[in-house]
């Protein structure tokens, strides 16, 4: 099974990055301005995108501030169903955050996998920028 694995630095503290991942305002700052964002393990985050006929439904598996956010995809495009997404956040001694991003469990490295890989790279750059500056630049702005 192919996986998407990325590592990048953010010039913001882990708690700031964590809030960008786990709050409605945070997700609206870098991913989508239309999202339902509960905060408890077992609840489902629902993210919408323009022209998409469905929401991306992500069950919260772990939400340990400020170290880890993990989701399990329970709704969305067929290629996403039963995949797992995790954001590991580590404090850098010199300041800032080391982000370890995993999106695991794709069935095959098909065209959709390649598209998702490309878009995650683009979107995660927006996450870093938002956490560093506080200026929203969402991927999907309704």
PLM features per residue range, with description:
Residues 105-142:
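A conserved amphipathic terminal alpha-helix motif
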Residues 13, 47-48, 115, 142:
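Alpha-helical scaffold segments that form or flank carboxylate-/histidine-based iron centers
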Residues 17-21, 27, 45, 60, ...:
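Hydrophobic pocket/interface hotspot
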Residues 36-37, 51-94, 98-100, 104-106:
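Hydrophobic-ligand binding "helix-grip"
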Residues 7-11, 46-48, 59, 88:
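Generic structural detector for well-ordered beta-strands
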Residues 39-44:
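Short coil-to-beta transition motif at edge beta-strands of beta-rich domains
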Residues 1-36:
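Hydrophobic ligand-binding cavity/cleft-lining segments
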């Amino acid at each position: 099974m192919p996986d998407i694995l990325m590592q990048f630095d953010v010039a913001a503290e882990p708690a700031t990055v964590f809030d960008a991942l786990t709050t409605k305002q945070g997700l609206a700052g870098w991913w989508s301005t239309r999202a339902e964002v509960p905060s408890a393990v077992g609840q489902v985050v629902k993210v919408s995108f323009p022209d998409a006929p469905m929401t991306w439904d992500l069950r919260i598996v772990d939400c340990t501030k400020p170290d880890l956010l993990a989701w399990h995809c329970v709704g969305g495009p067929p290629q996403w169903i039963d995949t797992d997404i995790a954001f590991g956040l580590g404090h850098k001694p010199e300041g800032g955050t080391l982000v370890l991003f995993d999106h695991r469990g794709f069935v095959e490295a098909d065209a959709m996998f390649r598209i998702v890989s490309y878009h995650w790279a683009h979107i995660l750059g927006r996450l870093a920028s938002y956490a560093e500056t506080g200026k929203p630049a969402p991927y999907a702005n309704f």
